[in-house]
């Protein structure tokens, strides 16, 4: 261990890989507290669709960055990094081990490495204005949208192909939110870790993972996911950014009579599998992870290996 830096354990992996169970059992072994590294579990009232850990599952282990915002609030990597850094300091000062567990790659990466992020947080009123302006651009074709971007950020326009509409919209959205140019954004990864980090990941075959994801979606639906989404819509949260998350956006058309339930469930499973694939690509390409093979290691075997590395 590097005594000059706070020691943290980070557990990553795709959705439905078992991060929650492993992190809780590890916390029991090493006197740890858990910081959620999930961009959606910060929201209240969004429990089933985010696979949020229940009080029973916590089993007395303190969890942080869960249920801290309303669904109409915004949350960013900048906010996560700021809050997580404060929590790590507090947990460490109390003689315990911070365990960050989650699947939001950018959040984890921004915390571990020396990322400088700008605050993109906006108020609900500001976000509404930004959405209105973006909606007004929907009628533009790709080239017209690219020309619009070039009017205020020529550098980004030069680096983004006109057919890459998503990246173009991202640059425009960034400008509308911050009044700054995405091309000037200071976001530097220096590959010097802020912490003495034990970075672990849970992996398994794609076939096994996809089977677990499909089963988890069925369990979520059995536990009342549809009703959860329905209640959020009834409370006026339908147009919120948080409701674009997988598990929520697929069921809204059913509630509005625009899609049949079975098709929405199929979309939900497909989107979840695609998201898991993107997560694994991120972790394997952008982070130096020590992988634990869930198919060939029991929970106890994984815990034994982790505690051996800590010693």
From Swiss-Prot:
Cofactor list: Mg(2+)
Swiss-Prot/TrEMBL site (Interaction with substrate tRNA) positions: 104
Coiled-coil region(s): none
Listed InterPro entries: Dimethylallyltransferase (IPR039657), IPT (IPR018022), P-loop_NTPase (IPR027417)
Function in brief: Catalyzes the transfer of a dimethylallyl group onto the adenine at position 37 in tRNAs that read codons beginning with uridine, leading to the formation of N6-(dimethylallyl)adenosine (i(6)A).
The protein's name: tRNA dimethylallyltransferase
Residues annotated for substrate binding in this entry: 15-20
Zinc listed as a keyword: no
GO terms for MF: ATP binding; tRNA dimethylallyltransferase activity
Stretches the record annotates as Interaction with substrate tRNA: 38-41, 166-170
EC number: 2.5.1.75
Pfam families: IPPT
Binding-site residues for ATP, renumbered to this chain: 13-20
Keyword terms, alphabetized: ATP-binding, Magnesium, Nucleotide-binding, Transferase, tRNA processing
